[in-house]
Amino acid sequence: MTLSIITINRNNAVGLEKTLASVAAQTFKEFEYIVIDGASIDESAEVIKAHETEFAHLKWVSEPDMGIYNAMNKGLKMASGNYIQILNSGDCLVADDVIERMTQALQEKGYPNILYGNMVKCFPDGRRLVDKGFAGQEITMLGMYTGTLNHDSAYIRRDLFKKYGYYDETLRIVSDWKWYLQVIIFGGEQPQYVDMDVTLFDMEGFSETNKDLAKVERKKVLEQMLPSAVLADYDQFASPMDQFKRLQRHPLAYRIVWFMERCLFKMEKAQNKKNKTAQWN
């Protein structure tokens, strides 16, 4: 098993320094590290040069690109590892032995096409939230309609990009989600999960503008990939299903709502019976 880690960066020298330091500190050293810098005008290139000797297999370029996913695709085409991890500038590996433990997990699980762990979201106010994604549950279209697989905490077989294609560079926010949609939902590739914190994800740059654009792009992708009648059902029922799943995680609240629903059902049943009796009379 060989691994290629890809970091993309543009004008984020401070974040890049954190990312490079976390990767350089790994106890497992035999991986390929690829840094794609988008012709930054800050100190990013100097940061990379300062860390060059810390990596056994480092490739890096600093040149103009056409956006995040264009940069990712550049890195993918340069990669030679069996597995890929994309770790964006500003994000870090949670501990010095993460790669070592993830490679062990790959072996234990029979080298699946995709293995993912947990992503720890780091907020500007100091809060941290562990995002386990689907946490090993079967990933369905309903789950992908509102959720996604966090790509920075996933190890992906490089061959999957040859089979399903690279990231859609016409999208600015959700191309990784679209790729997972194609691979998991339409391609039938079910990822494996390990309950391990893998990455620290910097939430500081995630704005409401990004959220709004992500919604617009998701809708565009779904309209392209799903029949309109099917999409209409997901539009109508996805939110109630999320609410139902949330209730299931809280047994007392679930029992209260279940009891109320049963009461409403019996009331409606009695009313329907009364209406039918009135019709016969």
Question: Could you describe each region identified by the protein language model?
Answer:
Residues 1-211:
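Nucleotide-sugar donor-binding/catalytic module of glycosyltransferases
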Residues 52, 209-215, 246-255:
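Short, charged low-complexity intrinsically disordered segments located at boundaries
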Residues 75, 184-188, 206-207, 222-225, ...:
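Short amphipathic alpha-helical patches
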Residues 95, 176, 180-181, 214, ...:
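Solvent-exposed, non-transmembrane amphipathic alpha-helical segments
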Residues 97-105, 226-230, 281:
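Peripheral/terminal regions associated with large enzymatic or DNA-binding modules
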Residues 196-197, 201-204, 208-234:
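Catalytic core of nucleotide-sugar-dependent glycosyltransferases
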Residues 227-228, 233-281:
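Membrane-proximal basic amphipathic "stem/tether" segments
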